[in-house]
Every structure is written in C-alpha cells, then in structure tokens.
Amino acid sequence: MKTILSILLLVTTFTAVLPAQREAVQFSVKSVADGDWTNPKTWQPQRLPKAGDRVLISSRTSVRFDAKTTPVIRLIQVAGTLRFARDRSTELNVCLLKVQAGNHCTERGFACDFNSLNTNGEPNAQPGKSLPTLEVGTQQNPIPAAHTARIRLHYLEGMDKKDAPALVCCSARMELHGSPLKRPWVKLGATCQPGDAKIVVNENVSDWRVGDEIIVTASKKVRNMGTYRDEEVGTEERIVKAIDGHSITLDKPLRLEHSGEGEFRSEVANLSRNVIVESADPDGVRGHTMYHRHSKGGISYARFAHLGKEGELGRYPIHFHLVGETMRGSAVLGVAVVDSHNRWVTIHGTQYLLVRDCVGYKSVGHGYFLENGSEVFNLLDRNLGVQAFNGPRLKDQELPFDPNDGAAFWWANGRNVLTRNVAVENAKYGFRYDCQKRSNFDSNLRVLMPDGSRKIVDIRTLAISRFEKNESHSEGLYSVALAGTEGVGPDLRHPHLIRDLKIWQTHYAFRAQLPTMLAENIQIDHAVYGIYRPWFENHVYRDLSIAATGSEPFNRGLDDKSMQHGSITVDGLAFSKLSYGGSMPLIQISANNVNGEAESHFRNVTVRGRDPKRPDRWPLMNLGGGPRFKPSTPKGVPYFIHDYFGPGKHAKVISSRAKDLLEDGNKYSQEKGLTGDESLATKVSGIDFPELLSPVDDLPPCT
C-alpha cells in the first residue's frame, strides 16, 4: 500500500509541477519608474526584489542594475530595459531571465510566451518597434575592464530541469559585451620545457590581466582519447601571475613540453572575461542561453562557463535558434566558452552569423556546431576549439547520422566559411564535415540562395565554398574529415575549396572523402596517415607537404576498398623526414578503376630523407598495406609522374596485377626508388597534364 501511495504521490507531484511551467505567473515585484535596481522607489511594492521573487521590468521603464549582488531571484521578465551599470562590479543571481514583450510570462526556459508563436513556442511574426532590452554593455561601450558584470544561473525546485535555469531572448534585444582583448588567443613564441614557469608568446598581450585563467595547448598526440573527460591530456591550465608584453609568468610550472618554434606551435588562450554568464552549480543542474527569431544584439568578450545540459537537445551555452536571416549583422566575438556539457556555439537554422576570435574549451559533444544542414553564409573566423569530448546522441536531433562524437567544428552544409580556426586535442575530429542521405533523413532541404530566394536542393551538391588557413593538431583520431556524401558532390566549376591547411601530431590527417575538390598548400607533419581514404574523383592537389608520416602518407582510393572513381592531379608533392617506416609506399596505387576512365597524374614530386642504407624502404609507388586486391574492374588505374626522367619524359606506373595495363604495348620493369614489389614502371611521352577543374567565384560575401 505504501508503494502505491508513493507512486500516486510521485505522479501527482509530476503532473502538478510540469503544467505549472506553462501557466502565466503572477509577478511579485514590478518596475514602475526609471531608476536603479537598488532604489525601492523603482518598484511596486516599494522594496527591493528578494529571494524567490518573480520580477517584471515593465515596458517603457528602464532599470539600471547596480547591485553588488542579489539573492536568487526566481524569474525576471524584461519587457522594458534592464541595463547593467558600467561604473561598478555587479552580480545578478537568477533562475530564469527572459527578455520578451508583454506582461504574460511562464516559467518555461526554452519557449517564448507572447502572441504569434508556433506550437513550439517559437516566434513567427516580427515584433514592434520598441524592443525589450537586456544590456550588459554594448559593443561601442562595453563593461570597462576595471569592473565585472556577472549573471549566475541557479536552479530552483519546481522548475523543469530540462529548461531551467536559462537566459532567453525572445524577439527582443540582448547585448552582452565585456572589455575587448586585442587577441583572446595567441601562439607560443618559444618552446616551453617541463618545469618552466614563464612562457613567451608571439604577440603582445599586455591587455591580459594578472589572475586571468589561461591554457597552454598540447603539442603532442597523447593517445586515442575516446571520451577522455577523465584521461591524461596535453593541454595545461594555469593562472597568470605577471605579464610583461610577450612574457607571461605562471602560477606554477608546466608539466609538459609545448612547441613554440617553427611552423608548428601550441596556443595560449585566455579564458577570463569581465562579463560572465555561468551556472551557479556546475555539478548540479546547469543553465543555457539562446536567441530566438527576430531578436537583435550580440555578444563580445564575455565568458560562458559551466553551461549546457548534457544530452538535452537545444540547451547549449550559446544558441542561435532558427533565427533565419532575422539577425543578420549579429556576431559572437572574443567569447570564451569554458567547461560546457553541451557544445560551445550552436548555429541552428541561422544565416549570416559571424563567430570570430572565440575560445571553446571542454565540451561534451561537438563544439562549434551547425545543427540541421540548412545553415548558409555563416562565417567562423580565427576561433580556437580545444577538447570537444565524445558525447551522447541527442534525442530527436535533426541529423540522425551525427554520432556527436567530439569535433571542435562540425557542419553539414558547404556554404559556410571557416577561416583561420585552430582545433586541438579533440576526441574524434578537429574539423568534421558530414552530410548523408538516409531513409530517415532527406538531404534535399529548402536553402537560402545567393539571390535571396529559397530553393530545395540536395545540400550534398553545395561545395565547401571556403575552408582556408585552418589548423589542427594533437587530435584524438582525425584532424580534418570531409566525408559522408557517398560520391555526391558539386560541379566542376564549384569544387570544394580547401586551402592553406596545417595538420600536425595526429593519427588520420586529412580524410578527403568527397568528390570534386581543390586542395592546395596542405602541410602534414607527424601523422600516421596523411591523405586518408580519399574519394578520388576530380581531385586537384597543389603544393602538398607530407613529413614524418609513418604508415600511409598518400592513401589509395577509399583505402582498403582500393577504388578510384575518377581522375586526380597532384602538382607539387614533397615527402620528408622519412627516418622511420617500413616498406610501405609513399603513394599507394588504387586497384579498381570504377568508371574505367580514372587516371592519376603527378608533377613536381620530391622525396627527402630516405635512409640510403635501406633502399627497400619507402618506394614512391606501390600497392601498399592491407588487402592485396585482384582488380574487380576490367581496367586498372595508370599513374603518371610527369618529367620524372627529364623534361617531357614521364614515368607511367601500374600495378603488377592490372592485366589490361600490362598488355598496353609498353615494356614495364621495376625502377629503383620508384616502384615496389607489386608495381612496375615504363617511360612514356606525349602525355598532357590535365586540367580537371575550372573553378569560378560567383557567390556573394558571407556575412
């Protein structure tokens, strides 16, 4: 009987609490005049808001938040203006802070509460001219560096743990702006040794402050990390004790070496800001923030700490939720997102957003995340992403093929720009592009076009329009993986564009598993695999450097499937630091010529660092490791190295198993340094170096 009563009590409590979240609240305190938060005359009744209050900042009133701290307010609805003081440090403790018009408010921490909403509580009509406003500094007049403005999100009993605590902007204005930093993250200027308590960086950071939290990122690949939330890592956290231009004194010595010379250097990132939004209880119920459609404002140089609800869809530290083009001109600049349990910055059904100079440090699941594949014309520039952990799939997530396994940057629509970003020590990927068509997902989506119209298009055909000057190092498994379309891709005039990419200290460096791609100026250093599992079809590589890559520097088509779907050209390929490795080839030969027309053309290939005492090591071209295929297609793949024997005298290399090529009338033999035990070569002439692509730039600016 006690058990039955307990169950009935539990059900009664559950049904009593949750519907309450959808009921309009009665405000206990309302603003009735412009004035300071700490002035009783601002309020009706004439007293300061106290613990547990539900507070309304009434329309046509402006309240200056000047409190050094507050008790935990249950709910604040900003229908007028709540402006944080700029002449003192302030702290607001609150469970639910909603910026929205009207006097009607519920305790839902995701949905909005006014008219013109859809069934999910999302705005579908433009607001009036006067916008409710939460202003914690502005971009032109941020909170001065001498002061802090802090919003602490507390969970209170009776709130829905899936929704609260929260900071939500519903077709209103929300401005969160701290004191700018010239560079929120920089590169090391000199190598740090274990035991060093002073570091040198490559740029002046005199605007950083004593007491700031910083990280020095990993320089080595520690291990295959998996989740690695509780595993050994190479990134180290420290506190600044002193700053002198380029020199930073730490609170305690470093444990590991961190590279700071040459091409490949670790980063130093500042995690402190003077505008802070944080969960009050990181080990308890965490909070989240979001902008809804038709909102205004932006975020700069703020810290978002201990936010994100693990495993809950839509509850992220920074979330632009289905805003479409309505927030064009908004930006997230110089933000630090620290210790998130659900992403760093989520761009969901949103276009024309700028995310620049941000630092993401520790996330469960992907970090910088574009959620449903419809997002276009967003720009992610000069952001740092460190330690995105393996996370759970989210219930009802829009892209069912995404395992949420820990990428610093994850996106599914190529019409977004990623430039000058760095990914470090993430569980699975530094950068991951993935777009699949499945029985439970149709990749034909309604997408914004450059002319402003909308069109249903297979987003797998939209090229990665600009992926430039990005870097990845010390990753758990992959550095850059562009894959998933099963051979569907863009046309020859709009190839995927990958430029100026730097990858080091990783396992799989560059998974180029998309057709129709131009990749130029790619540096790979200290990887196990270089170009890995490529979908060779209209691939053009220029100026590719692969160094100290010990297993398969330039993989065959689709690796163990050994399938080449079309032709490739490689102009400028340098192999170096070959001090280890066995008899694997530098370039693996694909066995199967899927359409019968595939060819591979190489030019300006150099090899440095072979061991002269081991001529059997590192032949230039051979079948390589893994299965020894007998070709399943009638034709093999011919490989041409232009000018190998001198100007106009080319090498043609084939697999010794390709019967059709063995019978093409040429005399094949092994060539020292060029062929291995399962490849043969001959000298040919009169072979043109093909032009596979004819790229044009006919897209508008991104933001």
State the predicted function of each range.
Residues 43, 273-274, 297-306, 328-341, ...:
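Right-handed parallel beta-helix
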Residues 194-244, 311-314, 320-346:
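A conserved hydrophobic secondary-structure block that centers on an alpha-helix together
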Residues 26, 32, 40, 51-52, ...:
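Surface-exposed or flexible loop/turn and strand-edge residues in extracellular/cell-surface modules
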Residues 53-187, 206-208, 212-242, 247-291, ...:
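Extracellular beta-helix/beta-solenoid repeat scaffolds
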Residues 6-15:
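Bacterial N-terminal signal peptides
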Residues 83, 87-88, 103-104, 281-288, ...:
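Short glycine/acidic-rich loop motifs that flank beta-strands on beta-rich extracellular proteins
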Residues 544-703:
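C-terminal accessory/interaction regions of large nucleic acid-associated machines
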